[in-house]
Amino acid sequence: MDFQNDFLTNPLRVTLYNPAENEYTKTFIFLGSVPANVLQACRKDLQRTPKDKEILQNFYGEDWEKKLSQYVVGGDGDDLDEFEKLFVEDSGEETNVMMPEIETMYSEYSIFPEDTFKDIREKIYVATGIPPYRQHIFFFQNNTLQVTYRLLLSGSGVALDIRDYKKEFQQVGGLNIDASMESQKDELYVEALDSFQLIKNIHHIFVADLNTLVAPMRRQISIAIEDNYQFDLLYYGLIMKYWPLLSPDAFKLLVQSPLQMEKQYPALSPSLTSLKKRLLLEQKLINFTYARAQQVIAKYEGNRLTRGTLAVTSAMIKISPLVNIQINVRNVFDLFPATPDIPQLVVFFYSKTGPTVVSKHHITSTEPEKFSNKTFRVPTIILIRFINKKAFILTIQNNGHYFIESNWSENERHDFNSVVSTLNNFINPIIHTINDMGPAAFPRGGSLPLPSNEDIQISISSMSVSTFWPYTLSSKGFTELKSRWREYEQAGIISVRGLQQTGVYNFLFKKGIYSYDPHEIERMIIISSGPGRKMDINVALLQNTYAYLFDTNVAARWETIYGGRNIRIYHRVTDIKIEMFNITQEEFNYLWVYLFVFLDNLITGPDKILVNKLSQLHDKQQGKGASQLRALQEQDPDLYDLRKYDTQATVYSVLCQHPRPPVIYSEAEVKSMPPAKRKELVKYWNFTEGVPAYYSCPHPDYPHLSLLEGRHPLNYCLPCCQKTKALLGTKRFYINNTCLTKHTFVEQDLEDLNTQTSRHTLSYGKKIPVNRIAFLPHQIADELFLNTIKEPDIFCIVGVEQTMLGISNAGLFYSLARILDLAPKALAIEIAKAANTPQYYILGNGAGNMFSSGAELASLILQTFVEQKNQLLQWDTTWQDIFLDLVAICYDLHCVFFKDKQGDFEFEVSPNTIQKILSPSKKIAIIFDTDEGIYPMAITQQKRFLKNSEAQYIFTEDDPVMEVIQSMSEFMCKDNWWDIHDVKNIPGYTVGKKLINRHNFCYALLIDSDTDRPIYFPIRLSSYIHDDIPIDFDLRPTQIASFKETWKFITLFNKQYKQYEIIPSAVLQNIKKEFVGFLSEGKTGLYFYYAPTQTLPAALEKLPIATLTIDPRDIDQAILYPLEEPYPQQNKANKAFYINHLYKFLLIEFFDVLYGLQSNTTRKHIENLFQKTDFQKITSVTEFYTKLSDFVDLNDIHTIKHILETTDAEHALKVLQKNIFNFDYTLLSPLQSYTYDELCQHLKKLLTPRIEFYEDIETIDRGLINIYTSCQYSTLNQPQCEKKRLRIPVNHFENYIHILAADILNPLKHSTLLLTGLGVIDDLQFILRPQEIISVKNKF
């Protein structure tokens, strides 16, 4: 890494320019801290001796005369994208020329590469006496005149060349002005860029002093500005144009009372004495940094970027295509489904109702409020993807630029390369999916480039990075560290805010930080309130972002946004940790040098402070409790930071109190220890680094290392020192041995231990460790289940795991695994197989409807319970119901629950389980749901359980316990409807099928008899059991028995089951006047259907007739299945809708043809011009841009310049051909030269090849899709397209051609026509998939 100050050997020259006389008056050369003989030789100017010239040549090089001359030299164009770049047409002045000899002054103030142009203004002030507000700075770069701000008029850049001052012929107060600016003053906007650009490679700048204009004309100006109109002409036509640092009030003060400027506007005119003092201190400190930089880099470079000393904890990668890409983010959002993998999406676009934000999320996720509430500047889509519970955020703008960001744990030790690699792997499949959308996403063609493509620029920003200085300081040493930063604060290099924490030094590093978003200051939030009135919140749009120099409110916000990068230095026992927040990779390299030069100075030089090198820490002694705990947490945070994994966990300092925490050593430290001391250590494990660690217990009262089990959320064993040594054969000895061998202590270890050591059963009400048992509460065991078992059998609750990663209430899952005697993962795999079924939606009484398919549900089960990759989020409340159903399906096992409500027990059983319990074949398990967790109930003998964990968990029909459960279920069963099995008792009839709805309830039976068609027999929604009667999840069948057969069965049923008598109350008639059924009496009247008949059955003649406008079956079918044969009415609606939108479809084809014709013509001009240009010659380049301006606008010239500056000549032409320019959108102008009749003929000629003609469109078999594209390139199945051409009736085509010609010739219709390029019928209509939730909000 190179860290040099080029301005020491190639100094900055500042030439003063007088616009009134159009002449250069004086040059200041900033030599900086050069040797005395160099300074002396420079100042001799024309009297230099040969010896002086030799000194200057040795110091500045062979071209020393050029560096110290009046020669105008620009930089190489690096990193100046933010400045207003203006193509300089033939100005008559070469940019690289010798100016007439003028006076030269030499300044000893240093210029540094990290100086912003704001810093340069201050240094010009101390050297020349011209305060910042009077400076108009300009310079040349790549033959381009540039200034340090941007002036926009109605959103377009204004040319700013102060050398044109004398060309303005209108005057106010004796000063030349641009009068057009005043008439459009409300449309002016100034964007200050001084703070967002470094001087870097610029070595010659020019300054026009406002005083050269104002001072001679002060009297005339004072008189003129008394008139408001003349004041506005002068301010907007001159001051705001060239000296925008001045507000109107500040300008007025400058004219009337210039000596008051420093008092009234200290930011515009700072105290010269204070500024000189600060800059000299800054110079001293920065010179010291540069002097030591290479030495420090060489000392630490080997470890600077390694995983051990660097940890990126958050980052954003920006991918910038070299070519412009038009991407329809609204359509990408619509076509991209929300899934458990990518559960959240947000889009911002301009809809028919204005700026609009739409968000959607998968039902297993939450609404992305954090992203939908953001402030957007351009149409943007945000996609959030989860991989192993880590969120990756992809933001794509409509110009093809996209950003990838994520966060990591410091312990993962990601460096820059691994961050880029990780984010690239995340992004690639999403980019492929978007690119496959074709014209729907890319209406002008093209695709998003992958991060690996050559046609892109990649930058890393918004990083949070931790780095480590491998030395440790005492408390006094860390205090000294803080005090030494005060000089940097006085020099303005850093800023210290607020209170400081013990052991942490927090400050903002300001110097050289410039990678901010200049637009963030634009919107000012103004809050006002007062007694007796509500708080008012207003958003003010700044017209001039230099307002931070003359408005205290803006200044406060400016300092908040642009005040520097947050740096935290942590005093640690083992090293010094430095955290840097929201930085770029370039800033990291720069800040690292400053910080490590500072830190290294603590241990080198005459004023070094006492430190202990990390490699010499083998002689650690037991320190104070806080420092000892900190050392443990610093070296192995995964082990000692328990709340990292569980916010409710007890902290280590409570589990192992002072003076019991041990001392930890690394392998490197152990190798340097004396053999005798090495023998005292216990080898264990560093969970953070994944390497061995060694422990000792130096405190004499607690000399023996012990390992605590069951306290860490991940079951890691925690070291802690004890008074006595664990004896062989004891429980503690077994735990220590297991922990030292396996590093964890888990369920099976506890089972093994309990088998050896546990001899008693716990009382009910306590938390039950895994594989321990507790007695049932007496009111259940001794009252409810009285006399159901005999001694020595006992009722008990068995302890099982209650949590897993991502699930806080996993007790039911582990209880089911224990009951079925399965490994938990084996259970999850089996029920996942069962979930992957077409009828997945019935699970959990319809909870399965949350998922788009059984495969998706199965995948989520595996990810959550086997791979443990997903957090359940909203599914967390429903997975238990789904699991209970799946266990019933897989193992024919049903569960009943006793829920402990503060000592009162509630018996809970699902309707399906009741049906099972009341059936002849039954198999149940009993589960207790308590405040401490969910546990299975069992019958066992204590000695038998202690020996081999044997117990009975499942109860069947002959078990006495089942009798109790059955009687309780019968009591709870309040269903007064008949039992399905009773139908079997009606001679000649059997239940052929049970019809089940999507909520897993039985709603009807199909009764078989000796007829061909079944009798449709509805029942109240009821639970059902899986028995020998088939079940059917489809719709009500259309082929059913006649009224005669149906009524015959109902008559027999009423006779046999008088308590359930079916009494018709109304006849059902459809719109065809057919009688199709009847409605029965009662609160829950049921719809009985039979085969349609034209004759009213005699048994129903006296009943009222109820007309079914739509058969409920048709509604169900429309919801669940696409219509195979649309209704005639639907055909008519589709056709009408098609005709209404046919003109929009024709416009899409028209613009697609026009894009190709217009763009290809202009591109050929550019290509020919490109091939004729020698880009190595300035005159040839100037001619290239001059001719280019004849047929493209200024913005396109900027784009072409950028491509040429960032791409080699051979590759540039390919990039130009792919790019989208402004000229691609100026399509209609050439057509306006036609007459109406000529244009109609021309349009016919253009569009006929794109049309598939029809005499008429008789039928449209399906509705139009909301997103449409040109039929020529469509990747969507569009009903308006055939053979890649647009279907149009012949009689409509002629009419549309005339309408299109009239619209083209009407200038008021231009914007309306261009908007059709969106390719959306209704931009607020979105595809709504079953598992998605969409919300829309307008942003004003």
UniProtKB/Swiss-Prot annotation:
Cellular component terms per the entry's GO annotation:
virion component
Subcellular location as annotated: Virion
Out of the domains of life, which is the source?
Answer: Viruses
Alphabetically sorted, this entry's keywords are: Transcription, Transcription regulation, Virion
> What residue intervals traverse the membrane?
none
Keyword Chaperone annotated: no
Q: Which family does it belong to?
A: Belongs to the asfivirus G1340L family.
Q: What does this protein do?
A: Putative initation factor.
Q: What name does this protein carry?
A: Early transcription factor large subunit homolog
